[in-house]
């Protein structure tokens, strides 16, 4: 039950309100949420299944794509089922520990996806700029080390947030006008000084996501320089088509992420009935569209999907 605490004791249960001002429309709003989530789940699961079962796709590019699809499933599953529970059953009550667990996986998976996109940019750089050395540079041993590094970075940087939140006393309103928990959104309900939470969150953002964006930009500048110096137009076109799908996913992922961050920091005058749905769309859009983009833009995956869905049935 949502309450305002006057005793000074810390709340252990919070209430996720859903979309403030649109509670009477929650059932209708849940329909596109549910369809998008099922699409993301099926699309990414199919992508993972095809990549893992087809030996012709056991290449670094597709293995990194498999990692991205797995992260997409985790990110959407961390948020959308909770939102649907609120929309359908008004099940908005969430314990503090569960709230912290949810935001831990949301933030760490976001950083993990950013790291995977950086690795994919590095993969494209080697494939286009050093094609003859591609297999000797991106060995299976290096790929395993990259996977471990991406995981350690994402979970390692977010892990201290658990203790930064557990130290706080939540003696203010326990009603959260959102469909899921996030770090600063929860911390602002504390009676303590949360400047360390704010600065730590900012430092994580700068040292991971912003750094990844800079390195991705540099890698693609080098790629474009190499592409436009290729001897034949056909080779240039083929190279551009190779990483076109990756560029689309980068724009989709970072564009939606930047919008969400800017809205949280500077969009205080944006009504919650607009901000909350857009925040969910920004989390759900990349997982839903990534398999579609790669299915359309990548010929090898397109062929394997068609073979799996249609030829196998015959």
Curated annotation (Swiss-Prot):
Q: Which UniProt keywords apply?
A: Cell membrane, Disulfide bond, G-protein coupled receptor, Glycoprotein, Membrane, Olfaction, Receptor, Sensory transduction, Transducer, Transmembrane, Transmembrane helix
The record's annotation in InterPro entries points to:
GPCR_Rhodpsn, GPCR_Rhodpsn_7TM, Olfact_rcpt, OR51/52/56-like
Superkingdom to which the source organism belongs: Eukaryota
Recorded GO cellular component terms are:
plasma membrane
| Cysteine-cysteine disulfides | 99-191
Any keyword Cell membrane?
Answer: yes
The UniProt entry, under SUPFAM superfamilies, shows: Family A G protein-coupled receptor-like
GO MF assignments: G protein-coupled receptor activity; olfactory receptor activity
Q: Where are the transmembrane segments?
A: 28-48, 57-77, 102-122, 142-162, 199-219, 240-260, 276-296
Q: Which residues lie on this side of the membrane: Cytoplasmic?
A: 49-56, 123-141, 220-239, 297-314
Coiled coil (residue ranges): none
Identify its membrane topology class: Multi-pass membrane protein
Principal place of residence: membrane
Q: Which residue ranges does the entry give as Extracellular-facing topology? A: 1-27, 78-101, 163-198, 261-275
Give compartment(s): Cell membrane
Q: Which GO terms describe its biological process?
A: cognition
Q: Which residues are glycosylated?
A: 5
Family (UniProt): Belongs to the G-protein coupled receptor 1 family.
Q: What does this protein do?
A: Odorant receptor.
Please identify the protein, giving its name as recorded. Olfactory receptor 52B4
């Amino acid at each position: 039950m949502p309450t305002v605490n006057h005793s000074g004791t810390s709340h252990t249960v919070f209430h996720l309100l859903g979309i403030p001002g649109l509670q009477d429309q929650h059932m209708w709003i849940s329909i596109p949420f549910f369809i998008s989530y099922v699409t993301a789940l099926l699309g990414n699961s199919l992508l993972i299944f095809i990549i893992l079962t087809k030996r012709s796709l056991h290449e670094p590019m597709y293995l990194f794509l498999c990692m991205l699809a797995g992260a997409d499933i985790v990110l959407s599953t961390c948020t959308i089922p909770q939102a649907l529970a609120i929309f359908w059953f008004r099940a908005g009550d969430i314990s503090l520990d569960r709230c912290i667990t949810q935001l831990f996986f949301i933030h760490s998976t976001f950083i993990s996806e950013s790291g995977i996109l950086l690795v994919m940019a590095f993969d494209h750089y080697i494939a286009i700029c050093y094609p003859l050395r591609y297999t000797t540079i991106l060995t299976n041993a290096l790929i395993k080390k990259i996977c471990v590094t991406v995981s350690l970075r994402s979970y390692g940087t977010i892990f201290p947030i658990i203790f930064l939140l557990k130290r706080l006393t939540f003696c203010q309103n326990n009603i959260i006008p959102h469909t899921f928990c996030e770090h600063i959104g929860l911390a602002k309900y504390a009676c303590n000084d949360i400047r360390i939470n704010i600065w730590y969150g900012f430092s994580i953002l700068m040292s991971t996501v912003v750094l990844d964006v800079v390195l991705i930009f540099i890698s693609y500048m080098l790629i474009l320089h190499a592409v436009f110096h290729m001897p034949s137009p056909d080779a240039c076109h083929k190279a551009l088509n190779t990483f076109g799908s990756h560029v689309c996913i980068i724009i989709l992922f970072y564009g939606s992420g930047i919008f969400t961050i800017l809205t949280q920091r500077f969009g205080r005058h944006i009504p919650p009935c607009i901000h909350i749905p857009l925040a969910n769309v920004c989390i759900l859009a990349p997982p839903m569209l990534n398999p579609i983009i790669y299915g359309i833009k990548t010929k090898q995956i397109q062929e394997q999907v068609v073979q799996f869905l249609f030829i196998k049935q015959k």
